[in-house]
């Protein structure tokens, strides 16, 4: 039993006058509050990821498929998205530092380390091309097909993981990738049978998604290699470094692709509340990876993706008169199944790593 002096150093232990029994009531209360707080946070993140994935898909499709007098220029939307992301990241970096240290951090980590900043040039450029391709895909595919087909990024990320990072996949993961490929193919069958109307081409949309997913897979794995092989820099600062290249590159793409329209009507031609909402949602959603890293595990991420696929399908039915066929529903089910199957091995490895006190890899942390 502890002596009187020892008790003085344990304020959480309550001793009654009648007995020397210590009752750690406050400790239990604190533990319950902490557990409840974590549970509430995970629930909030789960809801956010689900809404972000589904609403983003429906918004980008609706902004491109609706009938309007003036259609906005997608390259301008991509550029504004990069600007918004940069300002958000600068704000978050500034919140972590005093104004003086904030300016010092920008100078030392961007200007005084040009080689380190130059490393993110490749993924920054790739993400610009990828985002432009996603707008092309959204112009030719319904929201549900677009959402499901874009899950090919899991397949491409896995392939580049084997090629670039020299990691091996087990049989379960290879089987999951095969199921994913079959599921996407079945979903695309409905798209190829659909009538091409209003200048839409499901084949063009599918090719755009496939190329975008290949670029996304390569950029994600390349970015992981940068993070693991470079000096420690916060994720927000890395995004600021990428903005150094992505903002001028995306602005150049405007005049390379849509100079005639922009020169005649201006940058904000066709922009209305729906377009601005799409751009803002795209910008905030692009930073959701940081939320995944800090709070969400693979199970939460995959559940959010699966529910988002279902919500996107339901939204497409009501907003775009989309009628899913049996092959579409079968393909969607296979895609959802493959997502959980592929990550089940990763979740197990991550759990073992935590038990051993290891740091999870960026591949586990990033929402690929």
From Swiss-Prot:
Write down any Gene Ontology CC term: perinuclear region of cytoplasm
Keyword Membrane assigned to the entry: answer is yes
Its principal location?
Golgi
Provide the tissue specificity: Expressed exclusively in pharyngeal cells g1 and g2, lateral seam cells, spermatheca and vas deferens.
> Which key words tag this protein in UniProt?
Golgi apparatus, Membrane, Sugar transport, Transmembrane, Transmembrane helix, Transport
Q: Which InterPro entries match?
A: Nuc_sug_transpt
Q: State what the entry records as the consequence of deleting this gene.
A: Worms display altered surface antigenicity which prevents bacterial adherence. This is due to a deficiency in both O- and N-linked glycans.
Localization per Swiss-Prot or TrEMBL: Golgi apparatus membrane
Biological process annotations from GO: UDP-galactose transmembrane transport; UDP-N-acetylglucosamine transmembrane transport
For this protein, the record's Pfam families field holds:
Nuc_sug_transp (PF04142)
Query: Membrane-spanning regions, if any?
Result: 72-92, 118-138, 145-165, 174-194, 203-223, 235-254, 273-293, 317-337
Cite the GO molecular-function annotations of the record.
UDP-galactose transmembrane transporter activity; UDP-N-acetylglucosamine transmembrane transporter activity
Q: List the SUPFAM superfamilies.
A: Multidrug resistance efflux transporter EmrE
Query: What is the membrane topology noted in the UniProt record heading this document?
Result: Multi-pass membrane protein
Write out the function statement from the record: Acts as a transporter of both UDP-galactose and UDP-N-acetylglucosamine into the Golgi lumen. Apparently transports UDP-galactose and UDP-N-acetylglucosamine simultaneously, and independently, by an unknown mechanism. Functions redundantly with nucleotide sugar transporter nstp-4. May be involved in gonadal development.
Q: Which family does it belong to?
A: Belongs to the nucleotide-sugar transporter family. SLC35A subfamily.
Instruction: Give the protein name, as stated in the record.
Output: UDP-galactose/UDP-N-acetylglucosamine transporter srf-3
Gene designation per UniProt:
srf-3
